[in-house]
Amino acid sequence: MNKFLIIDGLNLVRRIYAAIPDENDMDSLTDRVSVACTKLLRIHHPTHVAIVWDGDEISWRKQLYPDYKKGRKPMPEPLAAGLSALQEHLKSLPIQSIYAAAEADDVIATLAMKTAKAQGEAVIVSTDKGFSQLNHPRISQWDHFNQQYLNIAELEQKLGVDRNQFLDLMALAGDSGNKIPGIAGIGPKSAAELLRTFRTLATLFSSLSNLGAKQAKKLAEGRDMARLSYKLAQLQTDLPLNINLRDFRVNGPANTQQAE
């Protein structure tokens, strides 16, 4: 069975970079990233591996909602200046790069789902909880920094909803980290309570007459924003990727791919 290790490039690199005392020490960063990647290969024994990077194009989410990810700290200048050299160095490892047109997340999600549907196993290396929406028994998520798989049961308990309600929760309450708005006046706790009662957004919005007037008004006025937020939070899993799985076989020929 194929096992595809899919590394969220900037998620890994930026976390490692943040722990380096000297922000200009790119040699140390390169060494630490190389060690991390080698460790990932040793732990997971994949048949295939890729590291996916964000591209420079404006994402469709930003075009749909200009405030998406607004206010995020930009990449530190030393890292931005040294990233190309780091990516070039990684070619010396048996880890091939894929460059997304815009956001890496949709490419990662598509790779994972295509692998799972082909009866393979996909392991996503990232601390981004957004990947938890990929509800498939052959997709898992590895937190390199805590050296453990994402525990979905713990996340469900923390959020107060089932996994299949994660997107509905973000549609109602938003996601402050990505500046996904949600509905004004509906926080995570009240959103979870609503979903425990009504289970889905569709049922909730068809049952507003069962709610108090104030809450029903918030939901009615925020319905369009909830739909937008759901769309922003939902990962694309069917992108047309111009890649060949053979190119990412461990110990295969070095190659760099551009995702379309």
Curated annotation (Swiss-Prot):
Record: residues binding Mg(2+): 105
EC primary class: hydrolase
Chain sites annotated for binding K(+): 172-173, 181, 183, 186
Keyword Endoplasmic reticulum (UniProt): no
Details of cofactor binding: Binds 2 Mg(2+) per subunit. Only one magnesium ion has a direct interaction with the protein, the other interactions are indirect. Binds 1 K(+) per subunit. The potassium ion strongly increases the affinity for DNA.
Keyword Cell membrane included in the entry's annotation: no
Family matches, as SUPFAM superfamilies: 5' to 3' exonuclease, C-terminal subdomain, PIN domain-like
EC identifiers of the protein: 3.1.-.-
Domain of life of the native organism: Bacteria
Gene3D superfamilies, alphabetized: 5' to 3' exonuclease, C-terminal subdomain (1.10.150.20), 5'-nuclease (3.40.50.1010)
Spans annotated as Interaction with DNA: 185-190
Any one of the GO BP annotations: DNA replication, Okazaki fragment processing
Ranges of residues in domain 5'-3' exonuclease: 164-259
Gene Ontology molecular function: 5'-3' exonuclease activity; 5'-flap endonuclease activity; DNA binding; magnesium ion binding; potassium ion binding
Keyword terms, alphabetized: DNA-binding, Endonuclease, Hydrolase, Magnesium, Metal-binding, Nuclease, Potassium
Pfam families assigned to the protein according to its UniProt record, in alphabetical order: 5_3_exonuc (PF01367), 5_3_exonuc_N (PF02739)
Cofactor(s) for this UniProt protein: Mg(2+); K(+)
NCBIfam families the UniProt entry points to: PRK09482.1
Function: Has flap endonuclease activity. During DNA replication, flap endonucleases cleave the 5'-overhanging flap structure that is generated by displacement synthesis when DNA polymerase encounters the 5'-end of a downstream Okazaki fragment.
Family: Belongs to the Xni family.
HAMAP family: Xni (MF_01192)
Name this protein carries in UniProt: Flap endonuclease Xni
